[in-house]
């Protein structure tokens, strides 16, 4: 860890499904408190657990925060359940998993487990309120804010040591994201759609939408993520740059940011 209050590692950033260069969505955040490094995950999409081994011991994660329950954001919790339950060093202590209401049942179904106990011995499942809520864990303060998507979905505002990362999760452009993103040092925003395509409303954002959100928020920098393998990420970057003059870059697997 550096002297920076919070470090972000892009474990996976491919939109909608794993691509040839990256697993699906997963972001590792690390911060120091009381003489140790705390580690949380924002999402754990398909393919991400394998890549997580490259960056840290997966058994050392303190909590998982899920933005929503689509497969590309939550499904590797199944493998993580196996790892924590059956690891040769013994069953691991239960850790909290925060997500929308119904997360425990969704993950039990995904693994074809009886809902009781499901994964509740390995993970202490907690639900955000309908509109969101605030969680404090070690050095981290995590604020969840309901955004617009076909399922219950949340943007996550994470603060540690006076520095702030805002992760859009999956969302269309909305007032709620604009509000929760205000003052973000780093805005990690999804750019699944291309401007000019026939894009359904309240589903995903374009690079231009991300640029406008960053501008409205007065963000320190914008990192574009969740571009699906069928699009060219350079298009999203160009769109964002046309809307916002601040620093823009494309998320790539393995990249780290000191915030």
Question: Residues of each region from the PLM?
Answer:
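Binuclear metal-dependent hydrolase catalytic cores
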Residues: 2-167, 172, 179, 237-259
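Cap/insert and terminal regions of metallo-dependent hydrolase folds
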Residues: 173-258
């Amino acid at each position: 860890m550096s002297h920076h209050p919070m470090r972000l590692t892009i474990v996976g950033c491919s939109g909608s499904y794993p691509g040839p260069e990256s697993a699906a969505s997963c972001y590792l955040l690390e911060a120091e408190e009381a003489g140790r490094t705390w580690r949380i995950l924002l999402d754990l999409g398909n393919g991400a657990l394998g890549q997580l081994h490259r960056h840290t011991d997966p058994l050392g994660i303190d909590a998982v925060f899920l933005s929503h329950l689509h497969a590309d954001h939550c499904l590797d919790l199944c493998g993580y359940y196996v790892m924590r339950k059956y690891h040769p060093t013994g069953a691991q202590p239960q850790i909290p998993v925060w997500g929308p209401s119904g997360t425990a049942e969704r993950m039990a179904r995904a693994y074809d487990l009886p809902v009781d106990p499901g994964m509740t011995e390995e993970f202490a499942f907690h639900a955000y309120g309908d509109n969101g809520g605030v969680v404090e864990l070690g050095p981290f303060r995590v604020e969840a804010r309901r955004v617009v998507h076909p399922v219950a979905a949340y943007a996550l505002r994470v603060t540690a040591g006076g520095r702030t990362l805002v992760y859009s999760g999956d969302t269309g452009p909305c007032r709620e994201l604009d509000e929760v993103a205000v003052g973000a040092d780093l805005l990690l925003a999804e750019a699944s759609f291309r401007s000019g395509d026939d894009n359904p409303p309240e589903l995903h954002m374009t690079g231009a939408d991300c640029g406008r959100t960053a501008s409205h928020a007065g963000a320190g920098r914008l990192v574009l993520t969740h571009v699906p393998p069928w699009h060219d990420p350079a298009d999203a970057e160009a769109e964002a740059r046309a809307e916002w003059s601040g620093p823009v870059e494309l998320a790539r697997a393995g990249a780290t940011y000191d915030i």
